[in-house]
Amino acid sequence: KNITLLFCGEYKDLNTIKKYLNKDIKITHIKTKNRLVKKIRYVDNYSNQRLFQNNLNENNKFSTLEEQKVINKINKLKEYYDEVLLFDYGYVYSNDKLVKFFKSFSKKLTINCQSNSYNFGFNLADKYKSGKIISMDEPEFRLVTRNKQDEIDNLIKTNSKLFDKFKYLIITQGKKGCFLKKN
């Protein structure tokens, strides 16, 4: 299988990414002004608990020109691949124009939509209306449904219309596993 990672950012960050990838993965690079998001966590040595963290480069945004370069590159690549994986962490790929663009891949689009301490509650998966697979963790699903009390299996059943245009809905629960709903 051919796997291509589309990386947008500075050249110096590209080498950081390459260190962690299998050599068989091809990298297509688009130079943008964006830098890798860097999280610096401060941990108590005794309890091994995080005390706080600093986050750098989380406000990166594509310029209009950079955004168009990304769209053009993906349009050139898309015919060569059976699957498109989108990891939406609420950074540069989650702006309205790119979300709308990714909707054109609905038959082969797998989305993992996650929030983090920087954008918790602001990067919700319900901005995606259709695709092959959508995945999120339980707290993020609860944010979408605006319900923090009900049992998760009942919550999935009563809110099945939210993601019924996806073939599969995955709600992860960390070490407890996940729920998989087939539509």
Task: Locate the predicted segments by residue.
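Ribokinase/PfkB-type carbohydrate-kinase core domain
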Residues: 1-183
